[in-house]
């Protein structure tokens, strides 16, 4: 049983890494010039750093309307040093439907970044 379990975990890790890379590539392409996508080696979240004037609470509210969950940077600090950043879960498969929603969200981010 241990071999099957280890094999399952290895397959799952590979799948999640592939999804994270796909999401990062999508966001980099659609947010170039307005945000930096930070990718760490562990976990399945991406840290998005928008331009300093962007308040990611606005992005959070827009994302909620689209049923996309993000974590505004304000959740990760006691002051506003990360108010222009947000975290997004990249473990989901980038389906056509999810891609369409994320496209709308990235267009919104581009609009408020001007």
Describe the predicted segments one by one:
Residues 14-24, 36-49, 59:
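Conserved glycine-rich beta-strand-loop-beta hairpin in the small C-terminal domain of fold type I
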Residues 48-86:
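Conserved C-terminal alpha-helix-loop-beta "cap" of PLP-dependent enzymes
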Residues 7, 27-37, 113-114:
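Surface-exposed helix-capping loop/turn segments at secondary-structure junctions
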Residues 27, 48, 88-90:
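Preference for bulky hydrophobic residues occupying beta-strand positions
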């Amino acid at each position: 049983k241990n071999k099957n379990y280890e094999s399952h975990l290895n397959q799952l890790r590979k799948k999640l890494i592939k999804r994270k890379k796909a999401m990062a590539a999508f966001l980099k392409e659609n947010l170039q010039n307005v945000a930096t996508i930070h990718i760490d080696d562990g976990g399945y979240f991406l840290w998005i750093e928008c331009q300093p004037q962007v308040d990611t609470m606005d992005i959070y509210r827009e994302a909620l309307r689209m049923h996309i969950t993000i974590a505004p940077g304000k959740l990760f600090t006691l002051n506003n040093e990360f108010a222009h950043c947000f975290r997004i879960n990249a473990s989901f498969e980038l389906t056509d439907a999810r891609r369409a929603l994320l496209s709308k969200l990235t267009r919104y981010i581009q609009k408020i970044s001007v």
